[in-house]
């Protein structure tokens, strides 16, 4: 899918795809190319889950707010990776 295409781009270490759903929800799909970026850890902050390198969540809120909050959490994970 789209998320795998984004992840395949040279230099990309993590990719996120946001999809607006009905009833003010957003589906988030997150993928990582490297184990040091644990996207599952980020998704769990939004009541999601999955695997360290492939995870997702359905998050209540507007696309703009969910995108802002999720990318802020992912940025924190990337900056604090081991």
Task: Name each model feature, range by range.
Residues 1-82:
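Gly/His-enriched, cation/cofactor- and phosphate-binding structural elements
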